[in-house]
A protein has these predicted regions:
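C-terminal amphipathic helix plus adjacent low-complexity
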Residues: 135-165
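Catalytic-core helical/loop segments in enzymes performing group transfer/polymerization on anionic/lipid-linked
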Residues: 39-40, 125-132, 149-152
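Nucleotide-sugar donor-binding patch of glycosyltransferase catalytic domains
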Residues: 63, 97-136
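Short amphipathic alpha-helical segments
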Residues: 34-36, 56-57, 91-94, 111-113
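A donor-sugar binding/catalytic signature common to diverse glycosyltransferases
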Residues: 68-111
């Protein structure tokens, strides 16, 4: 289950910004800055994170009042995020590359990450490696571990649940 995507809005975001990465860590990330290396495109980020891009990338800080962050997520090629179920659902249902942040001692995140990796629908990086992210290495990790066909198993069950109620 996730918020309803707006295909027209997603297409408009893709047209305006081109290839993109969506990074959201919330306020629980211990870093003030994240450096992104080897990426040409747009980097969408949410409040609480300062992104420094070393290549020919454009950083777009989404205002806290952005009501449709899920459409930006769905318009992006890759999502780097904490392992909360809202973001996981949106990433899986939009069939995006999902890179989850391993946070030591957060058992629910660890269990989510391990299960999604086992299913071949996500990869992970350690929170301690967030200070500097090499997108070339991330893309290689994705290519080696995410099985695109496995993403087809997921659909938004909101309608099914409403019918049951």
């Amino acid at each position: 289950i996730c918020r309803r995507f707006d295909p027209d809005r997603i297409a408009a975001i893709k047209e305006q910004y081109g290839h993109s990465v969506f990074i959201t860590c919330g306020k629980s990330a211990y870093l003030n800055n994240i450096q992104i290396d080897n990426y040409d495109g747009t980097i969408f980020t949410t409040s609480g994170i300062n992104i420094i891009a070393t290549a020919n990338a454009t950083v777009v800080q989404l205002p806290v009042e952005t009501f449709d962050t899920h459409n930006y997520l769905a318009a992006s090629d890759t999502i780097i995020a904490k392992a909360g179920w809202g973001t996981i659902s949106e990433a899986l249902l939009s069939k995006r590359n999902l890179v989850l942040i391993e946070r030591e001692g957060v058992l629910e995140d660890t269990e989510n990450i391990e299960e999604l990796k086992r299913r071949g629908v996500a990869v992970s990086i350690k929170e301690s490696n967030l200070a500097r992210i090499d997108m070339q290495a991330i893309n290689e990790l994705i290519a080696e571990n995410i099985v695109r066909e496995h993403l087809d198993a997921y659909h938004n069950a909101m309608g099914d649940i409403i019918r049951e109620l």
